[in-house]
């Protein structure tokens, strides 16, 4: 697999991850606290793919590295929110664990 093919596959995978985050966030309770986390996780979880896509369209190697670092940071933040959701038992583990694994 060459770099362009890898990049296309990872763009697709990160977009699918963003969709899974949106679906996961819709399972959260309708409390004020959960709405705050829903907003945070949706923003960080969908940002991973958006920044990766931008990295693939970067104008320089420096810009590429910067966008990749942002994607990594957003993935770390998303994992943090998923861990909080898990610790609070807001979503069943069989639904949450695959999303955590993909993060």
Q: Where is each model-derived feature located?
A:
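Amphipathic alpha-helical assembly/interaction segments
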Residues: 1-103
């Amino acid at each position: 697999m060459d770099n362009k093919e890898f990049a296309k596959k990872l763009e697709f995978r990160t977009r699918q991850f963003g969709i899974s985050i949106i679906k996961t966030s819709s399972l959260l309770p309708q409390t004020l606290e959960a709405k705050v986390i829903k907003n945070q996780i949706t923003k960080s979880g969908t940002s991973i793919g958006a920044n990766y896509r931008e990295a693939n369209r970067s104008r320089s190697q420096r810009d590429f590295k910067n966008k990749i670092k942002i994607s990594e940071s957003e993935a770390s933040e998303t994992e943090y929110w998923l861990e909080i959701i898990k610790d609070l038992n807001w979503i069943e583990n069989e639904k949450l664990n695959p999303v955590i694994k993909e993060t």
